[in-house]
Amino acid sequence: EIRLSLVGSEMCIRDSNQIEKKKSEQAALVYKEWLEEISQENPNNENLNNLLDKFLNDYKNTGYTQLALLSKANFDANSNNYMDSLDNFKKLIEITNGFNGNRIYNKIARVSASRLLLSMEKHDEALEMIDLYSSSDTNGYIHELTGDILLEQGKIDLAISQYEKAANKYTDESSQTIVAMKISNIDM
């Protein structure tokens, strides 16, 4: 009886792996279409949105969907469609969150969304977007972005503190110089 259940479990796992492999192959074909469209000199936004919907509806848990969301969010931002860009970054955050998520894409999406929210003067939302990273010992860029948001909120001392943390984290001279300029501009 135990043997029978083990054999059954093994068959389910094998079938599940075959289904996932087939789904990944299908997603790869859709991604090929995606690349062809987004690589055009003037990509058709409606086609991109239709392909993105297909990814989200049929292949949500694949890396192809994450790549498509990231490239569409960047495309929208470059086309001055900031709300669409923000929406796609938020979708990317949602599917890359959690234990089995993709931390790198999640961080990229959060930082990019935060920058967009800052430009829209939605300072509290911008801070919330990166709070996961700014409250921990993180890289210089997150501290600098946090400083930018706090400065816009008029929280001068907190902004300077974040800029100083950023300067200490940066290893390249140009980033350190930029942060130093931001601090000196505050003091003026």
Describe the role of every protein-language-model region.
Residues 70-137, 141:
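Alpha-helical adaptor scaffolds
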Residues 125-188:
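Extracytoplasmic/periplasmic C-terminal soluble domains
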Residues 23-26, 44, 60-65, 84, ...:
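Structural signature of alpha-solenoid helical repeat junctions
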Residues 42-91:
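Extracytoplasmic/periplasmic/luminal assembly and interaction segments
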Residues 1-8, 12-13:
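Single conserved hydrophobic/aromatic residue that forms the stacking wall/gate
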